[in-house]
Amino acid sequence: MYEVLQRDGLSIDLLERLSYKSELGISLKKNLHYFNKDDIFEEISKINEWYDEFEELYELALDYRIKSIQSAILKYERYYPDHQARKVFDDLLGFRSLCDNYDNILILNSIPEIRIADMSKGKANDDGYRGVHAYFQLSNRHYPIEIQYNTYYDRQFNNWLHKYIYKKKFDNNIGLRLRIMYENAKIQNEDDFKEAMKHVLSDCKGY
């Protein structure tokens, strides 16, 4: 199972060193209302600076991103007050990796520090996204690190969803209908996606 991480240049040792321990004195399993908002965003700002200076990140041949303060604030406002801090701020550092299938990724769940979110068949409230996310968390005082795994087939569609659907805050059903069309080969490229989106949004029955 460790080979899955090693393939991308990751290891438990590296993920441990990339794990930031909160100095707020509160378990990150606690809901957001237990935290002082100014304190938590001051800490997130420190985390961003810490990752910016972490040279080993630049050496990885793997896509990664450090979550912006603005994005973290939006997520906070969306989930305050009754969501756990560790689940709201579970992607301050996020990696993206491609895989041939999800079976090998799911076995990462055997690693004690890793929690798996299996969306390979969709989310509970299906919006068309497909993938498996692994969350490495060293302890309840450490912020999780997210690793997103997608097949190439799913990554292509997910990218179109993100570009054209998510930021416009359309109903989840729009993404799901487009996903069904993608799986039925009615969408094969980005132009097809845009054309199909127009029809779905206008609810064109004849498409």
Predicted segment positions?
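Short low-complexity stretches enriched in small and charged residues
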Residues: I12-L18, K46-L57, L98-I107, D191-F193
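Surface-exposed, low-hydrophobicity interaction/linker segments
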Residues: F35-Y80
